[in-house]
């Protein structure tokens, strides 16, 4: 079984001189899910949306082409794709000739699907930037915080009263790469229907990820699971938009299966 320590993270790696799909490094999702008590049927559906800003190849005549792309990896896939390996893989296309842009798109989709173990969709272009931001920010709450990890679900609570349907947001999520320790920065949005979630407790909970080491996808699944267990919403959506590194950013979204409408697809200004 592949582990994060076996990947190219934190190592000096020669950039590939030619197309090489073996560079893609899948990491099984099962271990991260077992750590938060998920061993059977998943309580969510969703995807990991990647934005690729540095994509290039050669056309049939050897002239360079450039593009951006959006990749959708379903959360039902047995494996996630380690980010540095995806960067190296995309760079392996730089000196490779293709007859058309569609051939490039299809090749990337096929290679990612093979390594993730499920159908990965690829489309050229990026979502628009959300200049306003969805939801009501909780970041201006005037509270003292001195707990930066490990993540503490005990902070999560609800208020008795009328059922609400609302969208809350924070730009203060920070976690760390589990191999290199590099900081990962994100905005997180949660949409739910249920008893009102205590906002001070929610902010303390999100800040408690600050010293936590885990992959982006696993952080979002932990947030979803903790909110589901502690706050028992009728339905829930959690999305994190992580800032760019190595020409890529990752945007995991997890939703209750009965969620009526998905969150709109946007990028953050910080991305």
Swiss-Prot record:
Species this protein is from: Xanthomonas campestris pv. campestris (strain ATCC 33913 / DSM 3586 / NCPPB 528 / LMG 568 / P 25)
Matches recorded under SUPFAM superfamilies: Tetrahydrobiopterin biosynthesis enzymes-like
Gene: queF
Involved pathway(s): tRNA modification; tRNA-queuosine biosynthesis
Membership in a protein family: Belongs to the GTP cyclohydrolase I family. QueF type 2 subfamily.
Keywords assigned by UniProt, alphabetized: Cytoplasm, NADP, Oxidoreductase, Queuosine biosynthesis
Any single GO BP term: tRNA modification
Enzyme Commission code: 1.7.1.13
Entry GO CC: cytosol
Assembly behavior: Homodimer.
Binding-site list for substrate: 81-83, 216-217
The protein's name in its UniProt record: NADPH-dependent 7-cyano-7-deazaguanine reductase
Location of the active site: 177 (thioimide intermediate), 184 (proton donor)
